[in-house]
């Protein structure tokens, strides 16, 4: 992945509704209708947030007739976690 990909993923998760949606998807695939039931937002607002999460690559969408099911793209997430995990943290000794 490119540096810009990590930026887009982190920006997507930096918004509270999208982070809440991501947290809901941690337990597995969900229909957009179920996400909508749990959040106090409109359908167009949900569509916007899901588009952002899908466009950055963190979430995959699969259409099944009239419903769309969303799941976390584990490969993309692992890439982001690997990027963040390569960070060396230093603590001051007191």
Where are the predicted features?
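Beta-hairpin "wing" of winged helix-turn-helix
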Residues: 55-64, 71
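Helix-turn-helix DNA-binding motif, specifically the short coil turn and the N-cap/start of the second
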Residues: 42-45
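Amphipathic alpha-helical dimerization/coiled-coil segments
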Residues: 1-6, 23-27, 74-94
